[in-house]
């Protein structure tokens, strides 16, 4: 059996409500099963004219410069779709997010659909999906003695924030 490629991705959006948000940036990295980076894509666009960005989203993602982008939303979505298709057509791929199934994944699907692209790229044609945060919940519950999960603000609660997990394991988290 062929080992699947891994496609890690994250989006930045104009809002916090999936029904009123637009993707303004998407970063994707293609790796082999041993996590060797084979290709990457980082693309953004300006907000659509009728989308009003939510201040909380703009404070979180700090993508104010996207307002000056000459890339249209359609062009960005088409390039994401084309890239993901090219990465996953000849070899099955697993699309990996961190806390992305409820928001990023659904928003990607909706925006593929709005722009007349097949919305289910991430789970058809032998492709699959993985939300690492859901996996971290299982690890924290059942394998807490095998993998260090940091505490939240030195309290009894655990922190599953990606930056906290990376910090405790000596991994760098690059924000673009």
Predicted feature locations:
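Short coil/loop linkers at secondary-structure junctions
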Residues: 63-64, 118, 170-172
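Short, conserved alpha-helical segments within structured domains
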Residues: 99-104, 128, 132, 158
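Substrate-recognition/cap helix-loop segment adjacent to the acidic, metal-dependent catalytic center
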Residues: 103-127
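Short alpha-helix plus adjacent loop in nuclease-associated cores
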Residues: 129-153
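A structural motif
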Residues: 153-170
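Conserved small/polar residues in nucleotide/adenosyl-binding loops
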Residues: 174-176
């Amino acid at each position: 059996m062929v080992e699947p490629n891994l496609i890690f991705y994250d989006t930045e959006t104009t809002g916090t409500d999936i029904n009123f948000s637009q993707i303004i940036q998407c970063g994707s990295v293609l790796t082999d099963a041993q996590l060797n980076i084979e290709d990457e894509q980082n693309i953004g666009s300006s907000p659509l004219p009728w989308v009003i960005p939510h201040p909380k989203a703009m404070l979180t993602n700090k993508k104010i410069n996207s307002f000056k982008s000459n890339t249209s939303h359609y062009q960005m979505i088409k390039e994401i779709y084309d890239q993901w298709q090219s990465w996953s057509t000849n070899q099955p791929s697993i699309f990996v997010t961190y806390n992305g199934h409820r928001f990023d994944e659904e928003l990607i699907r909706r925006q593929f659909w709005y722009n007349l692209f097949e919305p289910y790229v991430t789970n058809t044609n032998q492709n699959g999906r993985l939300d690492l945060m859901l996996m971290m919940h299982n690890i924290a519950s059942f394998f807490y003695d095998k993998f260090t999960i940091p505490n939240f603000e030195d309290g009894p609660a655990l922190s599953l924030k990606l930056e906290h997990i990376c910090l405790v394991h000596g991994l760098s988290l690059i924000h673009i």
